[in-house]
Structure formats: C-alpha cells, structure tokens
Design a protein with these regions (language model features):
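Active-site regions of oxyanion-processing enzymes, predominantly non-cytosolic
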Residues: 121-127
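Thiamine diphosphate
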Residues: 1-54, 108
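Glycine-rich beta-alpha junction loops
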Residues: 49-51, 102, 127-134
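Conserved thiamine diphosphate
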Residues: 6-11, 61-116
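Flexible, low-complexity linker and terminal segments
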Residues: 129-196
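Generic secondary-structure signature for well-ordered alpha-helical cores
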Residues: 37-40, 50, 88-93, 111, ...
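Short catalytic-loop micro-motif centered on adjacent basic/acidic residues
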Residues: 17-19, 94-99, 124
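Short, hinge-like loop/turn segments at secondary-structure boundaries
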Residues: 60-64, 141-144
Length: 196
C-alpha cells in the first residue's frame, strides 16, 4: 500500500486481496494473519469453495467435516476452520461470512469492507462459492446448495463481526445512501413538474 501511495499520491489507494480458501487458509494463513496483526489497511476476500478445485478436489481447511470429495474419499476428519473468528481475534475491524447467492448483498458487504479498510483497518470477507464440478451438481443445484446453507443452523448463515469504529463507517455509508436516494427522488420530481 505504501508503494501505491508514493506512486499515486493523488489517488485513493485501496488494496483488495482476492484468494481461494487454499491460498487464504492452508498456504497463506500466516501471512494473512500477520497483515491483520499489523493493522494493514486492506481487505482480504476469500472465495471459499471448500476444496482445492484447480488441482483435483483435495480437501482444504475450509471443507466441512465429513465431506467426501474426489481426493478425499473417506471424508474430511476435522472441523472447518472458523476463519471469521480468527480474523476477529487477529484484529480485523470487519469480518463476515456469506454466500454469493444474493449479489446485491455481496456488493454492499464488499463496498463496506473496502471503505472500512481504507478508513479504519483490516477487513475480511469469506464468500461461499461452491465448485459445482467438484461436488457433482448442476448450476441451479449449486444455487440451492448456497440458499440451503444460509438457513438457520446451516453452515453459511451470515456471521458478521463489526468493531464500534467500523459500525460508525457503516452507519455513515447508510445515511449517505439514503440522502442520495432522497436527492434523486427530489430531482426526478422537479423534472416531472417542469415537463408537465
């Protein structure tokens, strides 16, 4: 982030790290956590498909216990790593887990995460994105899988941790959005009156 700031001093520099669950949890957890400990002002987004899809379907730390995959034929023996809780304990000001079944919600969460990281400190977003090829499902079955896992008691019920500083940012963003909507409505009304 420092290099971006020195290279582009007049531009807002947001850093967003995009990685799969293998890179975030299994291979890169140490580096990810160290950035959180140091309060690096960037957002980490983990695309959690619960396995190593690019290399044949091996289990990842985020695979659910008991899940059977091509390269994990006996099922995973250990619980899924609770990464949102780790992010919270490591110093993230905003940490959440959700599925990609509701694109508008995903957009809102990511915008919040990026702005909180810019203004307050590190943020973490875990997005459940099932690999339908590896789990043997059709597209709509994958969507149903996400929706089912969001239900109460499901493994992807949205969890969210927000520090008081981050909540202030979220509240301000909501107020600004409401003001923009009211201004647009008033402008549209003026135009309608002028046309009539």
């Amino acid at each position: 982030k420092g290099t971006l700031k020195s290279s582009f001093p007049d531009v807002e520099n947001d850093v967003v790290v995009l990685a799969g669950d293998g890179a975030t949890v299994d291979i890169g957890l140490d580096m990810t956590m160290q950035s959180w400990f140091r309060q690096e002002k960037f957002t980490t987004i983990c695309f959690d498909n619960e396995l190593y899809a690019n290399t044949g379907g091996q289990e990842s730390g985020l695979m659910q216990k008991g899940f059977v995959a091509k390269m994990a034929p006996k099922g995973k023996k250990f619980e899924k790593v609770r990464l949102v809780e780790i992010a919270r304990e490591a110093g993230c000001h905003y940490a959440t887990m959700l599925t990609v079944s509701k694109p508008n919600r995903v957009e809102e969460v990511i915008k919040n995460a990026v702005i909180i990281a810019r203004e307050v400190g590190p943020t973490f977003v875990q997005l459940y994105t099932p690999c339908i090829l590896e789990i043997g499902k059709q597209s709509m079955e994958g969507l149903d899988e996400m929706k089912d896992s969001e239900q109460i008691g499901g493994r992807f019920v949205q969890r969210e941790y927000v520090t008081p500083q981050a909540q202030e940012v979220i509240d301000r963003l909501k107020a600004e959005k409401k003001e923009r909507k009211l201004a647009a409505k008033a402008k549209a009304k003026k135009v309608a009156v002028a046309v009539a």
